[in-house]
C-alpha cells in the first residue's frame, strides 16, 4: 500500500524467525489501535498515513483534503480526549454529515458561464421554477408557496411584489359581502369582484380584492396570514392574483397610478347629506316633536346605479339626514362625482341645491394590527 506502512501479516513474515514473534505482533496491533487517537503515531521515525488518517478525519472532522473529506462535522465531541466518558456515550449518535460531498472546483469556460448566467436569471421560488410567462396570465398563487420571503422574491422578480390583487376563497355559506369587508384592513380598495354559487340562495363563494396601492395589499396579506383574520369564526386563506396584460387591465392600472400621483382623496364611497334649507325653529314650536325628512332609498339607489353597481347604502348617524353609498368600483364613484359637479347634468339638477356629496372613507382603510 503506502511506504513504511506494515500490516499485521507483513509483521508476521518479517519476524518469522524471531523468538518474540507473538509479543511483536501484539505490540503492532496495540499501536494500530491507539494510532486512531494519536496525531503523531510513527514507526521507525515515519508518520503513518492512509486509512488511519482518513478514519480520524471522519471521526474528528479534520481537514485532510479539499474534495469532500471535510464535510463531516462532529457534534458534542472532544478531540483532546482519547476515551469517551460515560456521559459522552450518548453523544456518539450525534455525529452527522452535513453534505454528501462538497465537490471540487473546476474552472468553467466562457460559453458554459453564459449558460449558467442565463439559467440564474430564471425565477425560482422555494426551489420550484416559475415561468415568467405565467406571471400575468391570471394565475392565482398562494402566499405560502409563492411570496413567503418578500426580500428574496423582490430581488429575483420585483413584479411579484407589485401585485395589489388578493383573492379570498371558500367563504362560509350564508356570509354576506359586508361581513367579509368588515374584517379587511390595509387600505382603500380600487374595486371588488364577487363570485356566488349558482343556487337560488346565491351564497357568496369567492371575493377578489383590488387595493388602491401595493403597500396596502402587502400589509393585508401579512395580516391575513395570522389567526386574527377570521370571517364568522372561520380563518380564510388569502391568495395572490396576477392579471392578464390586456388593454383593459393596463388602462385601469394607469388610471389608478394617476389617482395615486395626484394625491387626491378618492374612494369608492360617497357621502350624501341633506343640506340645511329649513328656517330656524321659533320658540313657539320648540316643544313640538322634530319632523323627520323622508328619503326614498330605492330612488337614490336607482339614480346612482347609472354610474356603476352599488354595493350597499347605509345610514350615518348625523344631526341631518345622511347616508353613505358604497360602489363595487372606485371608477363608478368618480363618474358619479363628476356628474354631480357638472352644471346641467341630471345629478346636478336634482341633488346639487339640496344635497351635499363628497368622498367618504372606505371601510377597509384601517391599519393592520402589527404582531
Curated annotation (Swiss-Prot):
Entry annotated with the keyword RNA-binding: no
GO biological process entries: ascospore formation; ascospore wall assembly
Effect after changing residue 88 to G: In strain: SK1
CDD domains (alphabetical): RRM_Ssp2_like
UniProt cross-references to InterPro entries, sorted A to Z: Nucleotide-bd_a/b_plait_sf (IPR012677), RBD_domain_sf (IPR035979)
SUPFAM superfamilies on file: RNA-binding domain, RBD
Protein localization: Spore wall
Domain of life: Eukaryota
A cellular component annotation (GO) from this entry: nucleus
UniProt KW Coiled coil keyword: no
Alphabetical keyword list: Sporulation
Record-level Gene Ontology MF annotations: nucleic acid binding; protein kinase activator activity
Protein's job: Essential for sporulation and seems to have a role at the time of, or after, initiation of nuclear division. Appears to have a role in outer spore wall formation.
Additional remark text: Present with 3000 molecules/cell in log phase SD medium.
The protein's name: Sporulation-specific protein 2
Species lineage: Eukaryota, Fungi, Dikarya, Ascomycota, Saccharomycotina
The encoding gene: SSP2
